[in-house]
């Protein structure tokens, strides 16, 4: 099977936005106009093509980034629809890793919102070129220039309109192209028929003004164009487009477009802009990787002739075909039925079938080419972030970093039959989502699940019940506290057991001290003269690390400490690894009374957006939750409160905010750092945990 679309005519894009900016609807329209769907599904009717999990259709939000493929003007566009809710930023992070470009969708009334800032920052980290689509121009309060301004004010982005709307709200009739200076008027409800006319007289001045400042902004990124501009020479449309493309690819400039996906206006022009300004796989630098075992850096250019390399960026359990692994091919080609190497796990994998995904329907293909996104059936050992490569040309591509979960709940099966099913289902869900963890509490035997927020865990439990038919009861959410030391001390750990026959003997002196915040655990061996034999040193480190998992104060993991092993003794016959492991854990317990242990709680960065009149109530509420207000700013007609609040005080906040603001307030929160818990609360937690 020959390649249908050349690499130069391929685009891998993501669509990213704040929740409710109209991202899924925009994707729907793209699929409609590119001939992939025959009937348009509305998100608010729960019938959207991309939102294919039942929970997504009910809640009207996008949870998993479904990958789909479409064709436009003899190009292939692979689209990844990413979720806009902050609990799912891992999905965004994961998809940005494999994209070449992105469309940021903004709400024309609100402009840049908190989650837009989060995904924008993530896209900047990965150097992803972006165009901006200002959606909902038909909405009451829509203001194109205000929304464009928020890109500069809130994100510091060099963003500039390359289009302007004709009218707004109910009077939104068409779009002016600021490059060609043509006006497009829409003639039917589906937006499939439009006609090009002259710019209406009342818009002419504004259009010319915006075009002049567009040329100026683009000229600043291109020396040749700057010279022409300064010398007053005419700049042709083609020159302008080429310069915009180059500046966009360099992530120096962001073209801004407008429309209303719901009213079917502006989507085709936005698709044109995807082809005109966003990169093909050949426009982005070749991906870097290392050769396993040597740490030698190599690059894998986008080409079918290079050795095969791909990154698995999502694993899903599909009711029909089982485990589906989504991957992006960076170089070479992959045939179904072939063998590849998972270089991260050093495992050989057989690729059963290769599927090209379209939201939740699929088409089987025999070969995936470089630059393409597809899904494989039959990979047993591959998880998110793993590299798949040619067995003779091993490489490990840059992987992804995922945040630690911050919230946990206990979950119990309803019946004995549910118990076995639950274990299998939870491990499948954990395989799909690296920010979801499942573990068994060794003391209580309870199953604990952890994730990025209440909504995240709600949806996991929901999926257990629906997809895996597991009956389960969920406890109250628990905060993932941590412990650390504030003081340092030298302590002894001695484990001696002599009771006839071979005994046990391990003896260590360890200095424990605080480490820098975020530096983790550090172990230093300062043994001189073999007072603790070399072969037992790893056991000492292991003994300390294993004990750290259960802390010294209230049973929470100890973090950011340094342990220096500097003295000890051993017995020729009775010493062994186990004895030194136990001695090391005894030393850690002895440090409890000397190293001033403290409890740390996760602090969340919270942003609350509310109408002015509710400010007083919101500030009072944040303070009553032990929150620290960091700042306030006006955002359009609303006020934004930025604060740090302990996670333990944020449970049920969504409900409180709704009732405090009559449903008009919204908030986002994500984990920021750990802070020492106040003494009274620490005592309460210690008592509670001791009493259990």
Swiss-Prot record:
Cellular component, GO, one term: cytoplasm
Keyword terms, alphabetized: Cytoplasm, Elongation factor, GTP-binding, Nucleotide-binding, Protein biosynthesis
Primary location: cytoplasm
Chain residues that bind GTP: 17-24, 81-85, 135-138
Family matches, as SMART domains: EFG_C (SM00838), EFG_IV (SM00889)
Residue ranges of domain tr-type G in the record: 8-282
Pfam families: EF-G_D2, EFG_C, EFG_III, EFG_IV, GTP_EFTU
Disulfide bonds: none
SUPFAM superfamilies, per the entry: EF-G C-terminal domain-like, P-loop containing nucleoside triphosphate hydrolases, Ribosomal protein S5 domain 2-like, Translation proteins
Highest taxon of source: Bacteria
GO MF assignments: GTP binding; GTPase activity; translation elongation factor activity
Subcellular location: Cytoplasm
GO biological process entries: ribosome disassembly
CDD domains assigned to the protein according to its UniProt record, in alphabetical order: EF-G, EFG_III, EFG_mtEFG1_IV, EFG_mtEFG_C, EFG_mtEFG_II
Function: Catalyzes the GTP-dependent ribosomal translocation step during translation elongation. During this step, the ribosome changes from the pre-translocational (PRE) to the post-translocational (POST) state as the newly formed A-site-bound peptidyl-tRNA and P-site-bound deacylated tRNA move to the P and E sites, respectively. Catalyzes the coordinated movement of the two tRNA molecules, the mRNA and conformational changes in the ribosome.
NCBIfam families associated with the record: EF-G, PRK12740.1-3, PRK12740.1-5, PRK13351.1-1, small_GTP
HAMAP family in alphabetical order: EF_G_EF_2_B
Family classification: Belongs to the TRAFAC class translation factor GTPase superfamily. Classic translation factor GTPase family. EF-G/EF-2 subfamily.
Name this protein carries in UniProt: Elongation factor G
